Structures are given as structure tokens and as C-alpha cells.
Amino acid sequence: MPIQIEQTWYKHPLSMNLYGLNFTKENIKETGICYLFESEKSVLQMEGFDMLNCGVAVCGSNFNKYQLNILMRECAPKEIIICFDKEEQGNEDKYFNKLYNIGKKYSNYCKFSFIYDREGLISLKDSPADKGEEIFKTLLNKRVEVH
């Protein structure tokens, strides 16, 4: 959404950015892992966890080549873990395929995996980080690898 400061309008294309990368870049380099969230809130929630914050947000529900290039150039993660919000019930196959296809599309660049809640640990539209560190780690340990 554009913002006006004095007589000048500024706009920021969200698809050309990764929220939080400026703060988490060194952690991603150190661990080789990047958690890819939809919203900025999830990146901020990770700050309260007893683990390194390796999260960035795409500020939406899509991940594109431009954002991947930013990640690879700035910190070259060995694995990108897609941690998108849980989507509508009844469309589980569609949601699973969406996450899988994002990872598959870019799997030549690094390892991809994604969090897929099979056990109902998070509610509809929740981020994997919304229920706290313990649930996040449980989901993380059961993530789906993209081959």
C-alpha cells in the first residue's frame, strides 16, 4: 500500500523483498537453514524462541525467483523450509501440492522442504510459529522433504 510523505508517494513492491532478512541473514548463514513464512508476524515470533531466528517473510502466499535470488546471494542457505499458514480445510491436497510445487520449482538451487500439519496441531490460517516453539519444533521435525 503506497504511503504519502509530504507531497511524495512511496510504494514498496512486496514481491521484491524478504522481510527480516537484514536481521536474520547471519543466522541463516550460520545454520544453513532458512524458514520461509508468509507474514512478518511469524518472523517476529521467532525472536521469542530459544533457537536462532532464521526466518524471513514473503509478505504473501507466494515465493518467486527474485526472492530466491536474494536469499541465495545474501546467505546461500543449504535448505529452505516453507512454513506457510495452514489453508482451508477440504483443500488439503491442493495445499500440499502448492507447497510441494514451490519447493520442486526451485529445488535445483538448494534443498527444499515444507511444514505440513497432519495432526491438527495448528488451527486454520495459523502460521507454524503461532502456537509457540514446542509446536513449531514438532512440525519442523515432521516436515516433508521435496525430492
Report each predicted region and the residues it spans:
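Phosphate-handling DNA/RNA-contact segment within nucleic-acid enzymes
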Residues: 1-75
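TOPRIM fold recognition
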Residues: 48-147
